[in-house]
């Protein structure tokens, strides 16, 4: 994650590896998107929601260019920096694709609510499954509007 430089991906500043381990990241003052949407629904217009969607789509395009799959695109993992800027965060499930077209997860809990059918059924993750999750994110976000 430290290698990512994109205006809509939260920046990793550093890691303190001595116990307790600390991850130092860029501050997104307005918190996670889910809570922000719920508390500001009456003040948000469609243009702002579309702007948020566009910003997140550029972050996903950037990740695809780096051969990464995020695997957890959800409102809880999008942070609001300012009233007009969102950033993708929480790369705990993300994986590099290397020379393969997909990543196969062998074990562990996954966020089924947002996942693509092939990810649920076969535990296969591609950039297309990230796009599916992005679509679910847009659906969630616009239903609050």
Language-model-detected regions and their locations in the chain:
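Intracellular eukaryotic protein kinase-like catalytic domain
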Residues: 1-145
């Amino acid at each position: 994650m430290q290698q990512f430089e994109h205006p809509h991906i939260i920046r990793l500043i550093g890691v303190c590896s001595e116990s307790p381990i600390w991850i130092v990241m860029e501050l997104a003052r307005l918190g996670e998107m889910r809570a922000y949407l719920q508390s500001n629904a009456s003040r948000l217009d469609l243009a702002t929601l579309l702007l948020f969607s566009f910003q997140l789509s550029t972050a996903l395009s950037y990740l695809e260019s780096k051969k990464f799959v995020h695997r957890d695109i959800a409102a809880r993992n999008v942070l609001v920096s300012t009233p007009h800027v969102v950033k993708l965060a929480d790369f705990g499930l993300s994986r590099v694709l290397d020379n393969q077209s997909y990543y196969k997860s062998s074990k562990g809990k996954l966020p089924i609510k947002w996942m693509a059918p092939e990810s649920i059924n076969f535990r296969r993750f591609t950039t297309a499954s990230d796009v599916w999750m992005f679509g679910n994110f847009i659906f969630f976000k616009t239903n609050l509007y």
